[in-house]
């Protein structure tokens, strides 16, 4: 009787954090809460491949004083790609202020969202 050993490696899912606002939840602590969540992402083993910022979440990638700016910068340094919606940056007149990550477009965002597991905060 022969024994066969098969090693099964768990499939790691590609993930994207999709941010629609510059805060998590609602209320007075939402801005600082999101900064804490983003900071906690640095500690997890399976970091997301992308963080996508749309609507007023782009303010986090353009304002160095925003509580979430540093965690986003740290995530970028750890290899996470940070993308900001170009139309949103244009609407808020923030294109020239983009200081972390890259400007993206609707096509690229949809390509990523349809091929990655999404985390929304």
Task: Describe the residue ranges of each PLM region.
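Conserved mixed alpha/beta catalytic, RNA-binding, or beta-rich assembly cores of soluble enzyme
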Residues: 1-65
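Glycine-rich anion/phosphate-binding loops
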Residues: 31-32, 101-103
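Short amphipathic alpha-helical segments and helix-helix/interface helices
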Residues: 38, 69-73, 110
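General beta-strand structural signal in soluble alpha/beta enzymes
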Residues: 53, 83-85, 119-121
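A glycine-rich helix N-cap at a beta->alpha junction
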Residues: 67-91
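C-terminal binding/interaction regions
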Residues: 103-106, 110-121
């Amino acid at each position: 009787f022969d024994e066969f050993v098969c090693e099964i490696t768990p499939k790691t899912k590609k993930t994207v954090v999709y941010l629609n606002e510059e805060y998590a939840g609602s209320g007075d602590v939402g801005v600082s809460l999101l900064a804490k969540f983003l900071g906690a992402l640095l500690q997890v083993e399976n970091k997301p491949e992308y963080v996508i910022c749309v609507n007023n979440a782009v303010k986090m990638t353009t304002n160095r004083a925003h509580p979430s700016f540093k965690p986003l910068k740290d995530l970028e340094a750890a290899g996470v790609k940070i993308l900001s919606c170009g139309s949103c940056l244009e609407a808020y007149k923030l294109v020239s202020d983009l200081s972390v990550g890259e400007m993206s477009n609707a096509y690229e965002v949809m390509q990523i969202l349809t091929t990655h597991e999404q985390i929304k905060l």
